């Protein structure tokens, strides 16, 4: 039976291997025709970036020094060779195959003609930025440690993604999924130093975010607040750029049941229940957004959601639970708290504040203010004084119903619409937020922020209080989150999750399509939307991050494979390039030998590991081949597309003698342990109804699930949570679902004939 809305948990993976290459001669995916027959430059310097060069990036507009180009993190390029008058001539230049089939979320860094990009597990690709020829590649799975283990993939909430590298002083810094931080020689890709950043490997920590550099430090956070029985306790670690020696560590939430070691943790502890359950670590991971102000020497941390989501379980007596869902400023020299602002006090909805932040100088109230801007998940746009943390303005940038406004102290006023303690509630925005990790962009010319907005509700369920058949889902704790589309049918899920809102209740709210993605041009001074363009609907969601340029252009990739180019001032669509690949990352722009290029990483996955590929997504139509795509004026008219996806028919499933009770128990166990990665349909992880690799044999199936037989491919062992009887019940459920799919396939074929 096809489910017409999705249960979102959060990945597994497919195997890939890359080899360090000493020579720059290797197969590049494809190349477009050149506008001129001029031999491209051969790079002569590698990673030659210091803080002064980064801070004065506008003197070198052809470089893209960091994830957001410069130290402001604005994802804005001063280049204008490609502009609103000639962008119709933008065409394909070259592509590089990453040999992956998962989400790719990084914006490449380009320095002196060399492109540095990261991929799944924390792999790094150094390429000639003109031709795409590989200079070297780095695979953390070949460096010892746990980088290739399935446990790291099992603990990753949202695929085995990586959001970027940092480049400084001839080194490329990257973190692997299992939490090791590497400093690589920018010329060769060989490790200069490495360090394990994880404090406790018995907890489900992973790392997917990019390192943040200060004057002399590399700062890295982690993830894991959604996983296991009690998640993890968030922190960031700062290491010496040259040696890798740890200089300080900042925790974001107090440790349960222990005396606190710092003034900021003592203050935070007062906002938590002193008798809280020590199994629950608290969460607050810094899994993505960070920023740095060199003049103030402050590191800004975007702190994430709670562990678990439900505050009644996490901190029964209530409280704001600092520093969850906060923007936190830390002194880069001492590692001590400078200030904090909490966006969602006592967060119950996975409304972390981990989204990327932008530093800007804005004319507000008759003077120029040094601000930090963020559009976090909760639906409010924040403009804060970045020296003091004082709010300057806070305004909703999308529809929300969890809050009915702000009080005089800029604290959100909670509405009863989002209290799911007494029954499931339809809540806006959904857990992916009004805006997730996909970068927004600030254009200093238009003074507009371009936000990839997600407009969707969620139905949030307290499983125990709703008398559900399951009381825990890995990746969601004691809650379940359903994201309804226009064909929402609650009867599909009632057997597992109990009573649910009826269809008419879901269709209230914004008055627009229930689930859609919108690109919005937001004026942070006037606090309003200037223009908006719907980019996707019918549940493709998760379109790409945004880049703006001095050519009056805004670039955004989409899940359906389109790379769209808009006029920055009006939002008029100027150019569409069909790539055949789902795009989640933000593009970059750079110039080499007088030619401007636009590059973007393409590969669908990430949080969509928790759902089948939407029917109108590129990943449902084409193979989800990971690529770096590069474009220039007078490039090729057609961008090569991946091969079409061809599904083999369901094979007759193996015979079994399972009882209805065993199958029903297997359905519950599958929902609790397997469903956040393995969906029935085309998805990132395999559809288990399509038996293969010997898993049609019960003994082999047990070895895969309990012993980690396929750990090298990303399928970790579950012996800590499942028994042999549990696995047999899961297999019975899968075989039963395979039998239904095989039967339905035959009936469709018979009807067609």
Label each region the model flagged:
Residues 644-664, 671-673, 680, 713-753:
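Flexible coil segments in periplasmic/lumen-exposed cytochrome c-class electron-transfer proteins
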Residues 37-92, 256-265, 412-414, 507-509, ...:
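Blade/loop signatures of beta-propeller domains
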Residues 64-68, 103-123, 152-180, 206-228, ...:
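Repeat-blade elements of multi-bladed beta-propeller folds
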Residues 27-29:
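C-terminal motif of bacterial Sec signal peptides marking the signal peptidase cleavage site
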Residues 69, 386, 677-683, 706-707, ...:
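Detector for the c-type heme attachment site
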Residues 96-107, 137-166, 194-210, 226, ...:
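Extracytoplasmic beta-rich repeat domains
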Residues 667, 679-717:
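Gly/Gly-Pro-rich "capping" loops immediately C-terminal to redox-active cysteine motifs
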């Amino acid at each position: 039976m096809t489910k017409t809305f999705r249960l979102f948990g959060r990945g597994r993976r497919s195997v890939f291997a890359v080899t360090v290459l000493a020579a720059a001669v290797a197969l590049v995916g494809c190349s477009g025709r050149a506008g001129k027959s001029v031999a491209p430059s051969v790079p002569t310097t590698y990673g030659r970036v210091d803080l002064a060069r980064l801070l004065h990036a506008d003197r070198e507009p052809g470089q893209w020094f960091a994830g957001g180009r410069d130290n402001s993190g604005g994802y804005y390029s001063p280049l204008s060779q490609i502009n609103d008058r000639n962008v119709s001539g933008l065409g394909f230049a070259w592509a590089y195959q990453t040999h992956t089939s998962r989400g790719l979320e990084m914006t490449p860094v380009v320095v002196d003609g060399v492109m540095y990009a990261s991929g799944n597990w924390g792999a790094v690709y150094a390429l000639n930025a003109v031709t795409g020829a590989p200079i070297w590649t780095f695979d953390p799975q070949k460096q010892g440690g746990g980088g290739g283990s399935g446990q790291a993939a099992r603990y990753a909430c949202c695929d085995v993604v990586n959001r970027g590298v940092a480049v400084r002083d001839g080194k490329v810094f990257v973190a692997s999924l299992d939490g090791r931080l590497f400093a690589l020689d920018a010329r060769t890709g060989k490790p200069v130093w490495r360090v394990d950043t994880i404090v406790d490997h018995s907890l489900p920590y992973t790392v997917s975010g990019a390192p943040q550099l200060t004057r002399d430090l590399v700062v890295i956070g982690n993830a894991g607040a959604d996983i296991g029985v009690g998640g993890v306790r968030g922190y960031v670690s700062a290491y010496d750029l040259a040696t890798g020696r740890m200089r300080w560590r900042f925790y974001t939430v107090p440790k349960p049941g222990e005396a606190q070691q710092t003034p900021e943790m003592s203050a935070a502890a007062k906002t938590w229940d002193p008798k809280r359950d020590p199994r629950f670590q608290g969460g607050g991971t810094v899994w993505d957004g960070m920023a740095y102000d060199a003049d103030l020497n402050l590191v800004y941390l975007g702190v994430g959601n709670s562990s678990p989501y439900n505050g009644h379980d996490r901190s029964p007596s209530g409280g704001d639970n600092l520093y969850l869902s906060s923007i936190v400023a830390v002194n880069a020299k001492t590692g001590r708290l400078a200030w904090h602002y909490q966006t969602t006090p006592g967060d119950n909805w996975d409304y972390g504040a981990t989204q990327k932040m932008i530093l800007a100088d804005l004319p507000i109230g008759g003077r120029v203010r040094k601000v930090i801007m963020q559009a976090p998940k909760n639906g409010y746009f924040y403009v804060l004084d970045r020296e003091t943390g004082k709010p300057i303005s806070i305004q909703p940038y999308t529809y929300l119903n969890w809050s009915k406004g702000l009080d005089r102290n800029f604290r959100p006023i909670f509405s009863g619409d989002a209290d799911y303690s007494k029954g499931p509630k339809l809540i806006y925005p959904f857990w992916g937020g009004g805006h997730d990790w996909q970068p927004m962009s600030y254009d200093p010319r238009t003074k507009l922020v371009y936000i990839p907005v997600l407009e969707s509700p969620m139905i949030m369920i307290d499983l125990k209080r709703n008398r559900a058949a399951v009381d825990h889902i890995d990746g969601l704790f004691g809650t379940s989150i359903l994201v309804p589309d226009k064909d929402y049918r609650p009867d599909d899920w009632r057997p597992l999750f109990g009573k649910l809102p009826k269809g008419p209740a879901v269709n209230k709210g914004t008055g627009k399509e229930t689930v859609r993605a919108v690109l919005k041009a937001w004026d942070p001074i006037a606090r309003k939307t200037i223009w908006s363009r719907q980019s996707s609907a019918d549940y493709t969601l998760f379109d790409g991050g945004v880049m703006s340029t001095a050519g009056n252009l805004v670039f955004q990739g989409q899940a359906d494979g389109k790379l769209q180019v808009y006029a920055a001032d009006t939002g008029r669509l100027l150019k569409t390039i069909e790539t055949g690949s789902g795009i989640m990352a933000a593009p970059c722009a750079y110039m080499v030998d007088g030619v401007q290029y636009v590059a973007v990483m393409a590969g669908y996955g990430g949080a969509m590991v928790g759902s089948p590929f939407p029917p109108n997504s590129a990943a449902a139509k084409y193979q989800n081949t990971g690529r770096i795509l590069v474009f220039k004026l007078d490039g090729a008219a057609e961008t090569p597309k991946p091969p079409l996806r061809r599904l083999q028919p369901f094979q007759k499933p193996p015979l079994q003698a399972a009882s209805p009770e065993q199958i029903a128990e297997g359905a519950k166990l599958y929902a609790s342990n397997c469903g956040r990665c393995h969906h029935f349909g085309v998805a990132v992880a395999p559809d288990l109804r399509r038996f293969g690799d010997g898993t049609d044999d019960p003994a082999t199936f047990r070895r895969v699930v309990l012993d980690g037989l396929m750990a090298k491919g990303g399928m970790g062992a579950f012996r800590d949570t499942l028994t042999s009887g549990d696995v047999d019940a899961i297999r019975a459920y899968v075989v039963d679902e395979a039998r239904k799919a095989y039967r339905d396939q035959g009936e469709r074929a018979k009807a067609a004939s």
